[in-house]
């Protein structure tokens, strides 16, 4: 998600450096 970098790699998917499931 777009909030990956803010919420973390577990919650975001490719957002702001986050690569999680959502």
Swiss-Prot record:
Residues 1-22 are annotated as: Disordered. Expressed by the skin glands. Its main location: secreted. It is found in: Secreted. GO terms for cellular component: extracellular region. It comes from the Eukaryota. Keywords: Amphibian defense peptide, Antibiotic, Antimicrobial, Secreted. GO terms for biological process: defense response to bacterium. Coiled coil: none annotated. Antimicrobial protein. Has antibacterial activity against the Gram-negative bacteria E.coli ATCC 28922 (MIC=50 uM), P.aeruginosa ATCC 9027 (MIC=8 uM) and C.freundii ATCC 8090 (MIC=75 uM). Does not have hemolytic activity. This is Leptoglycin.
């Amino acid at each position: 998600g777009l909030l990956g970098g803010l919420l973390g790699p577990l919650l975001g998917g490719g957002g702001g450096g986050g690569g999680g499931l959502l």
